[in-house]
């Protein structure tokens, strides 16, 4: 225990003794830049890229003047750069006449879209009564078709019950099979009836056309 206390005291005295020496250390100042212009070496790989740009050269001339060694004629933009600057200026800072023309074209486009929208609305409103009438007609036809299917189904069920007897359950497989057969037979008869009517209509149309041709050919020529 006494040895540990003696060792701690030794370390404390050593730190006190080394303290002033560590505080007396002063790092050397960084090297100062020369007041004259700086000419970067393009052959040196350690030269930063931004020091080789025309912008840096222009800054050197603006800071140090003629002693920078930069010829003033090299600071003027080339004809291609001038054209690019003019195009950029026209894009970002257009003239008053250009802005007025652009505003006029925008207003003209807005007016054209407004007129087209109003015309489309007027056309839709003009078609609205006929559209409502067509919708009501389709709704009525669908309702009539549903009612006709219900009546046809009821007649088929009545016919099936007459054939099998009223004691047969309509939900039985035998009753449903007979109902399907009767439905197929009826659909077949309706299809044949429609085909017959179409055939008769074609024959009547052909006869009417032949009669008209005969009447035209039988007229005396003047």
Curated annotation (Swiss-Prot):
Q: What keywords are assigned to this protein?
A: Cell cycle, Coiled coil, Mitochondrion, Nucleus, Ribonucleoprotein, Ribosomal protein
Q: Where is the signal peptide?
A: none
Answer yes or no on keyword Mitochondrion: yes
Q: What does this protein do?
A: Acts as a negative regulator of G1 to S cell cycle phase progression by inhibiting cyclin-dependent kinases. Inhibitory effects are additive with GADD45 proteins but also occur in the absence of GADD45 proteins. Acts as a repressor of the orphan nuclear receptor NR4A1 by inhibiting AB domain-mediated transcriptional activity. May be involved in the hormone-mediated regulation of NR4A1 transcriptional activity. May play a role in mitochondrial protein synthesis.
- Provide the Gene Ontology terms for cellular component: mitochondrial inner membrane; mitochondrial large ribosomal subunit; mitochondrion; nucleoplasm
Report residue spans for region: Disordered.
Answer: 21-47, 186-222
Task: State the Gene Ontology BP annotations.
Answer: mitochondrial translation
Question: Gene name on record?
Answer: Gadd45gip1
| Residues in coiled coil | 98-207
| Subcellular location(s) per record | Mitochondrion; Nucleus
What family name appears in the similarity comment?
A: Belongs to the mitochondrion-specific ribosomal protein mL64 family.
Q: What is this protein called?
A: Large ribosomal subunit protein mL64
> Where is the major localization of this protein?
mitochondrion
Q: Where is the composition biased (Basic and acidic residues)?
A: 186-202
Q: Which InterPro entries match?
A: Ribosomal_mL64 (IPR018472), Ribosomal_mL64_sf (IPR043035)
Subunit composition and interactions: Component of the mitochondrial ribosome large subunit (39S) which comprises a 16S rRNA and about 50 distinct proteins. Interacts with GADD45A, GADD45B and GADD45G. Interacts with NR4A1 via the NR4A1 AB domain. Interacts with ATAD3A and ATAD3B.
Positions with biased composition (Low complexity): 203-215
Keyword check for Nucleus, yes or no. yes
For the motif Nuclear localization signal, give the residue ranges.
Answer: 184-200
């Amino acid at each position: 225990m006494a040895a540990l206390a003696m060792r701690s005291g030794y370390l404390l005295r050593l730190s006190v003794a080394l303290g002033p020496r560590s505080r007396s250390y002063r790092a050397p100042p960084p090297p100062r830049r020369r007041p004259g212009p700086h000419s970067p070496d393009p052959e040196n790989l350690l030269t930063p890229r931004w020091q080789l740009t025309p912008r840096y050269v222009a800054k050197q001339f603006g800071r140090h003047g003629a002693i920078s060694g930069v010829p003033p004629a090299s600071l003027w933009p080339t004809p291609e750069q001038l054209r690019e600057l003019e195009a950029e200026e026209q894009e970002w800072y257009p003239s008053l006449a250009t802005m007025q023309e652009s505003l006029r074209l925008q207003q003209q486009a807005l007016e054209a879209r407004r007129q087209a929208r109003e015309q489309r609305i007027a056309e839709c409103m003009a078609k609205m009564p006929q559209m409502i009438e067509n919708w009501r007609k389709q709704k009525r036809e669908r309702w009539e078709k549903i009612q006709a299917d219900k009546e046809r189904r009821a007649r088929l069920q009545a016919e099936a019950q007459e054939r099998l007897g009223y004691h047969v359950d309509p939900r039985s497989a035998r009753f449903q099979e007979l109902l399907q057969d009767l439905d197929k037979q009826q659909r077949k008869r309706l299809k044949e009836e429609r085909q017959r009517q179409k055939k008769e209509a074609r024959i009547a149309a052909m006869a009417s056309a032949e009669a008209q041709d005969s009447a035209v050919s039988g007229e005396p020529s003047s």
